[in-house]
């Protein structure tokens, strides 16, 4: 097995090699090696995307994760990933994002209300693979949820209430063991929900199982249990996601979450749970539609700040004029049994309401 460090490409050597190529050889039609080819030959894969949007809300999109303004054009995310992941031995992944979404991720990682830092190392970890065992050390995205941070992994523009109430990243250790070709188990230990570092010893355990018996059905279940470093008390969270591919064009997804934060000197704690269901239909090579319906019960107001029951319905139309670009048009309606949405903010007061509406358009380019 070749050691990973022997795969490095030295810039000086590339420049020297380029200078040594006679101009006549290029003129004669000799093939030119591209950077992408050099990376591929060295075992490094690269991928990326740019997502930008315009959206308008009747209020300020309270309890949404990334689309939090009233009326705006914005760069959602520009992402780039480099990965060296051989089937055995050492490897590494670096995944960086920039844009408005990165500010939200940075704020979550610093346990602050907001951040002006529009750049984030979303994932950065080393890994070691031996047989059915993969060990990762560093920062990685969560196992929880049907939706992900990268817009390329979602069928809707906006994220669900469930996504808002889930962790996004973890920093620590994760081990995945493939029991069979269709069953894997995951265990890990990390700093907790989104924390890149903590000043003392509180840690969170990560547990998961993934079942993929055939191309029609898959099921994942994951749990996070540990003392939260900021809320200073135990937090328990369980999530499961089931996917059913009825045909090559029609799929259904159901996601259920349950969580509890114990009370402490700094928080009253609370329980929450919710369920989201998705239906996705690709009716041609260029057109698709995605529907999402959701119910979220924040009994004690720990997640949203208001004890309330939330519901939402979302429809997203996707159009792919070419294979690496998608245009999305979305409509969403949120309701609550309490006035928990911010409708307007003035110098004198904040106006609350029990519903909010959003329309959005997003373009996603992948490379």
Regions flagged by a language model, labelled:
Residues 9-10, 74, 166-167, 271, ...:
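Short hydrophobic/aromatic segments of transmembrane alpha-helices and their interfaces
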Residues 8-11, 140, 289, 293:
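Hydrophobic alpha-helical segments, especially transmembrane helices
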Residues 167, 197-204, 230-237:
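Short, contiguous, pocket-lining structural segments
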Residues 29-194, 201-203, 210-218, 278-281, ...:
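Outer membrane beta-barrel
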């Amino acid at each position: 097995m070749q050691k990973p460090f022997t795969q490095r490409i030295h810039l000086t050597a590339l420049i020297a090699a380029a200078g040594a190529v006679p101009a006549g050889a290029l003129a004669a039609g000799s093939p030119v090696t591209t950077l992408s080819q050099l990376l591929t030959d060295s075992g490094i894969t690269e991928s990326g995307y740019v997502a930008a949007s315009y959206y308008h809300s009747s209020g300020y999109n309270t309890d949404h994760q990334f689309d939090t303004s009233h009326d705006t054009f914005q760069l959602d995310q520009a992402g780039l990933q480099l990965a060296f992941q051989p089937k055995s031995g050492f490897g590494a992944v670096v995944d960086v994002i920039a844009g408005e979404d990165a500010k939200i991720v940075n704020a979550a990682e610093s346990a602050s209300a907001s951040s002006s830092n529009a750049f984030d190392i979303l994932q950065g970890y080393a890994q070691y693979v031996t047989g059915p065992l993969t060990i990762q050390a560093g920062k990685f995205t969560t196992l929880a949820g049907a939706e992900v941070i990268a817009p390329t992994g979602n069928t809707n523009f906006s994220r669900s209430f469930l996504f808002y109430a889930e962790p996004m990243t973890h920093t620590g250790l994760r081990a995945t063991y493939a029991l069979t070709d269709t069953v894997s188990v995951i265990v890990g230990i990390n700093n907790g929900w989104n924390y890149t570092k903590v000043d003392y010893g509180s840690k969170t355990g990560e547990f998961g199982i993934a079942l993929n018996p055939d191309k029609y059905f898959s099921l994942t279940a994951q749990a996070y249990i540990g003392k939260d470093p900021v809320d200073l008390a135990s937090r328990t969270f369980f999530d499961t996601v089931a996917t059913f591919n009825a045909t090559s064009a029609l799929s259904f997804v159901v996601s259920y979450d349950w969580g509890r934060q114990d009370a402490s000197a700094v928080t009253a704690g609370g329980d929450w749970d919710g369920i989201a269901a998705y239906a996705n239909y690709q009716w041609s090579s260029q057109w698709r539609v995605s529907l999402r319906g959701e119910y979220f019960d924040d009994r004690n107001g720990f997640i949203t700040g208001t004890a309330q029951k939330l519901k939402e319905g979302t429809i997203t139309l996707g159009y792919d004029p070419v294979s690496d670009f998608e245009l999305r048009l979305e409509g969403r309606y949120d309701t609550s049994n309490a006035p928990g949405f911010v409708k307007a903010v003035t110098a004198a007061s904040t106006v609350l309401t029990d519903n909010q509406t959003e329309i959005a358009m997003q373009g996603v380019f992948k490379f």
